[in-house]
Amino acid sequence: FKYAFDTKTGAYVRTGMLDEKGKDTGIDPFQGSFPHLIDVGVMGHCIHGKTGLCAKAGIECYQNGMYQEATNMSVEDFREIVKQCEGKTNQLALGGRGDPDQHEKFAELLEISRAHNLVPNFTTSGYGMTENIAKLCKKYCGAVAVSWYRSRYTLNAIKKLLNAGVKTNIHYVLGKNSIDEAIERLRNDDFPSGINAVIFLLHKPVGQGTVSNMLSPEDPKLSLFFEQVEKRHKFLIG
């Protein structure tokens, strides 16, 4: 099959499977020969996690960021990964154990990505977000997600990114301890004005994540949640 990806807007289109004459058969491809988006774990430790603010906000880190300590990925290793991806993938989701925007060579990682025609994206707690970092995001990134930590630095990070013109999403971890708030915020459209989308992520019972905080498929609150999801909002929902 063939596809096209717009590095400015993120628009993606592709054909179905092609026959020997190059004609679209209308059959969806099972998979590509190479991922169109790749997660790259550039962070080995989490400055935000070690403050205990994740746990204070009710987020049980699946990366065990409060306790784990490792070195961040070197620029050389990152460059090698990017070279192997060039011409075969479209986007890099920078991640790992910590906020990618706090990597000591963050600007260089973004520059390398774009130099090889790859669009970098990442999720951050917003704990160390600055106006300069937000400007870098505007210059190089497709979108940035801010994890919902219910804190002043969360709102400040969102504001800085929006002011810089960055397509900004919110990542909201959904567990037993957060579903009531999610329902109420959706009911009232109570998320910062100007965001692109709220992406709901299920709580993971690994790392610092507990099994007791997992939502059950039979939980009646899920019906209330999806009732709100299906309504029209000022932002997209994923």
Put a short name on every predicted segment.
Residues 75-203:
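Radical SAM/AdoMet-radical enzyme domain recognition
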Residues 28-76:
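Canonical Radical SAM [4Fe-4S] cluster-binding loop centered on the CxxxCxxC motif
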Residues 1-39, 56:
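Flexible, acidic/Gly-rich N-terminal and inter-domain linker regions that tether
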Residues 35, 39, 106, 154, ...:
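A structural signal for well-ordered alpha-helical scaffolds and beta->alpha junctions
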Residues 70, 74, 102, 178, ...:
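Residue-level preference for long, well-ordered alpha-helices that form the structural scaffold
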Residues 1-3, 194-238:
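A C-terminal junction/extension of Radical SAM enzymes
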Residues 48-50, 68, 101-103, 178-180, ...:
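Short catalytic/ligand-binding loop motif for oxyanion handling, primarily in non-cytosolic enzymes
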